[in-house]
Amino acid sequence: MSEKNPDADIGRALADITEEAAALILPLWRSGLTVHAKADESPVTEADRAGETLILKRLAERFPGVPVISEEDASEFGTPDEIGRRFFLVDPLDGTKAFIRGDAHFTVNIGLIQDGRPVAGAVTAPATGQSWFTTAAGAVRRELGGPDEVVRARAWPDGEAIALVSHTLKPEHAQALIARYGFTHKQPMDSSIKLCMIAQGSADIYPRHGPTMEWDIAAGHAVLESAGGRLATPDGAPFAYGKASEGFKNGWFVARGAP
């Protein structure tokens, strides 16, 4: 992501939408709302559905004609057999399990895909009031009501590197990741906040050797690249979006800071 990306500034408009959805979701956090199970047995709540309804409405108003693939809609009705060159990926509440536990690591996400790449995106963490989004000048972080702050991913440190990992990562798998990628510390964390932490230089690597969906990471991937970081397959190959024939499922990936 760079100043040559004409779509990067769309991230600001997307952040307006994710922040509006966050304001809708936040009162439902720690409210004892009912949790339902989706077809794949993953949890879904009223907050997921309310956030998605608002986001879909706002995207239709601001970007008419651009297709949208969203998590809850896909869960209920399935994903399309094909998608065009340009479309949005929406996860209205990434980190639903954290949300249910009362943890703060859940996010609202919108990513714009063009020709298989994330070209704009916004991520908002309702519990902290923080947003990260793409601009033509790079990745930006802002607190609710505060000024924009340009953020940059850091280079791999000479000392101890920090990895962000899933709460469900088993110890034996953690040791295998340490051996492969050479980080020193690991910090459990949910949702796309992991990508934003690397984008702002607070961590160094997020190795994901497990299942995710495209909407889980598209927005955070856009922010990370805009901040000078990168996300690729474990072998370093570019990470593609729009995998309609695979149900928009991701393979393994590794997110890192600056080269």
Regions found by a protein language model. Give the residues of each.
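N-terminal subdomain of lithium-sensitive/metallo-dependent phosphomonoesterases centered on the IMPase/IPPase/PAP
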Residues: 1-93, 176-179, 237
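Acidic beta-strand-loop-alpha-helix segment within the catalytic core
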Residues: 110-196, 244-259
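Residue-level signal for inorganic ion chemistry
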Residues: 25, 48, 59, 96, ...
